[in-house]
Each structure stands twice: as structure tokens, then as C-alpha cells.
Amino acid sequence: MATPMTMPKASSGIILFAHGSRDPQWRLPIEAVARSIEREQPGLAVTCAYLELCQPSLPDVLADWSTNGVTNISVVPMFLGAGRHAREDLPSITEALRRQYPAITIRLQTPIGEDARMTELMAQIAVSSALQPAQ
């Protein structure tokens, strides 16, 4: 993932926003998504940010990116549904950041789990697990 030392000179970026956990293993799937985006779209800045329990926070990422020329940001909530964090906490944080960084466009996406493509993928994974031979 892009860090201040290795960040590409990109004007657009993606922040994968997740809840956070004290367990370092919990972060691995989300960080794998970020690495996949980096491989597929090397001209985009991409990183993960967390609500709590691990770093960096969304405000930390914006503080860094604001000094590195990233002015068009998509925040992608890595949640399966729109619970309280997606409905209340994240919009509140995002609105405060828009006020703090008026020159930066911050677009808050719907939670990833509410995308029909993700719903279909999860259904396919569940079905394939049921069709595997018993071991």
C-alpha cells in the first residue's frame, strides 16, 4: 500500500475504510484488496484506514494525502451492510474532513457488501462450499 515514502504522484486515490481490530490477522484481507488495486491501477493512490483499534485513521490518511497532491478521493466502506458506523460515524467523519480540506473532493461510497456484484459473489462462494464433497 502507498505510504508517504512510496506514494505515487497521483491526484486520485481510494481509501478502503474498515472498522479495525487489535488482531493483526484481521487486517490481512483488506490489505490484500489494497495490494490488488495497486497492481491493477498503479496510477492511483490506495491505502486502508480504520475507525478504531488500529492505524491509520481516516483523518491521518487525509492529512498525509493533502500534502501529497491527492485531491480526488473515494472512500470505500469495507462493510457488508450499512450499520451504525456506515450510516452515522463515517458520514460524520467524512463531513468534518470536507470542511477541513475544502480543496479535496471526498466521495463516500455505499458499503461494499451492498453492491450487487458482491452479493452475487458471496452467494457463489456459499453455494460452492455446499457442493464440495464431504471430507
Task: Give the label of every model feature segment.
Residues M1-Q135:
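Active-site-proximal alpha-helix that buttresses catalytic centers in soluble enzyme cores
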